[in-house]
UniProtKB/Swiss-Prot annotation:
Organism whose genome encodes this protein: Acinetobacter baylyi (strain ATCC 33305 / BD413 / ADP1)
Protein name: Elongation factor Ts
Functional summary from the UniProt entry: Associates with the EF-Tu.GDP complex and induces the exchange of GDP to GTP. It remains bound to the aminoacyl-tRNA.EF-Tu.GTP complex up to the GTP hydrolysis stage on the ribosome.
GO cellular component: cytoplasm
Record-annotated disulphide pairs: none
Localization per record: Cytoplasm
Similarity comment: Belongs to the EF-Ts family.
Swiss-Prot/TrEMBL keywords: Cytoplasm, Elongation factor, Protein biosynthesis
Domain of life: Bacteria
GO MF annotation, one: translation elongation factor activity
Coiled-coil region(s): none
Region Involved in Mg(2+) ion dislocation from EF-Tu, residue ranges: 80-83
InterPro entries noted in UniProt: EF-Ts_dimer_sf (IPR036402), Transl_elong_EFTs/EF1B (IPR001816), Transl_elong_EFTs/EF1B_dimer (IPR014039), Transl_elong_Ts_CS (IPR018101), UBA-like_sf (IPR009060)
């Protein structure tokens, strides 16, 4: 009997998109033969899910579910915006979000094992949806936000924001809209991750040195570039989306509002998409997928 290693399970999971436990079970039944495991999966009820798993799922939707002082943002990916608008896809995304919020679990592998209201696991429901719709579908990430007050904002299907705040409800809602539009990195300049500041400084130094200016001038140029960067990415330094004459910091002060935390999800962040297909290629791909 071949020993089933973690690397074997990971390889099968990467190739099929199935949960770790499903992959381990398939490998055990195939005595460690990955290709045989995939063949067996394709012969089973997971056939279409296994076949579609190699397709890049960079479209999709952000779903937000709130319950009192807790809210969850979930990104579920598919391959096309057409499927992202499908009622079955939307129902699945909402069911997953509710299960995550109820359990408090956001780890991808454990989320796959959560039970939905109809008794299916998330993974079972995902596979069934892949078989029904014909696209690769993945629950990519989730984040739970808790706070005294929460403001929720969605821009279509692709962007979702949850803001935890104290103070004015109107300002909280405005900040959620602002975060969706301006995509700040942190609440304040001091909270911007040090590695991002260091990277910006390194780039600024390289440009300044190329200018051939004296060292003291180079130092000022670098300082100015870093300051400009912080003004662009720190929430409190940005110009307010609802009133471009005011900085966010001024609006927060005037309304006695404090931003504790914000989370912004945008569909497909960090996922490399394939080049757009022509209409003829899309038709050919659809015909191939239907076989």
């Amino acid at each position: 009997m071949t020993a089933i290693t973690a690397s074997m399970v990971k390889e099968l999971r990467d190739r099929t998109g199935l949960a770790m436990m499903e992959c381990k079970k398939a490998l055990t039944e195939a005595n460690g033969d990955i290709e045989l495991a995939i063949d067996n999966l394709r012969k089973s009820g997971q056939a279409k899910a296994a076949k579609k798993a190699g397709n890049i799922a960079a479209d999709g939707a952000i779903t937000i579910v709130q319950d009192g002082n807790k809210a969850v943002l979930v990104e579920v990916n598919c391959q096309t915006d057409f499927v992202a608008k499908d009622e079955n896809f939307s129902n699945f995304s909402n069911a997953v979000a509710k299960a995550i919020l109820a359990s408090g679990e956001t780890d991808a592998e454990k989320v796959a094992e959560l039970k939905l209201e109809d008794g299916q696991s998330v993974e079972e429901a995902r596979i069934a949806l892949v078989q029904k719709i014909g696209e690769n579908i993945q629950v990519r990430r989730a984040k739970i936000v808790e706070g005294e007050n929460l403001a929720v904002y969605k821009h279509g299907l692709r962007i979702g924001v949850v803001v935890s705040y104290t103070g004015s409800a109107e300002t909280g809602k405005g900040i959620a809209m602002h975060v969706a539009a301006f995509n700040p990195v942190a609440v304040s300049a001091e909270a911007v991750p040090a590695d991002l500041v260091a990277k910006e400084k390194e780039i600024a130094e390289a440009k300044a040195i190329e200018s051939g200016k004296p060292a003291n001038i180079v130092e000022k140029m670098v300082s100015g570039s870093v300051e400009k960067y912080l003004n662009e990415v720190a929430l409190d330094r940005q110009m307010y989306v609802i009133d471009n004459d005011k900085k966010v910091a001024d609006v927060l002060k005037a309304t006695a509002t404090n931003i504790v935390e914000f989370v912004r999800f945008e569909v497909g962040e960090g996922i490399e998409k394939k080049a757009e297909m022509s209409f003829a290629e899309e038709v050919a791909a659809a015909q191939a997928a239907a076989k």
